[in-house]
Amino acid sequence: MKINYLFFLLITTIMSAQSVKLKDRYGNAVVYVDGLSLKTKDQYGKSMYYIDGQTIKLKDRYGEALYFIDGNTIRIKDKYGAAVYYFDGQTIRQKDKYGQALYFVDGQNLRVKDKYGASLYYFEGIPEKWVIVCLIR
């Protein structure tokens, strides 16, 4: 019940003001909301989530961005910082742990590669529904 009340209090405060700061027991801002901007910090003061209009960043414990969304661009990184998924409008790439592209979708073209980088499937001019079916395993 206490959590629900705190959440309701936070929502009420956000609706009634443009700027909101939620602090931890040491007085450090943990959640910061200002207009369309939202920032949350971890116990070391590093920003974990960052939302600013169309931009969203989710960081790991080392401060590296794992998820990055900016408009139509989406990047998802692995623990080494290499982009695993990349989406930009019509282009989608998925990479393996060595950075090799496994799936590549660009407009109406689709390539699927094996672990050695050899092209297994190549479609050109296929319907979008086929692309979705092939990408989901």
Question: Residues of each region from the PLM?
Answer:
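Long terminal segments
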Residues: K2-Y5, T13-S37, K41-K46, D52-Q54, ...
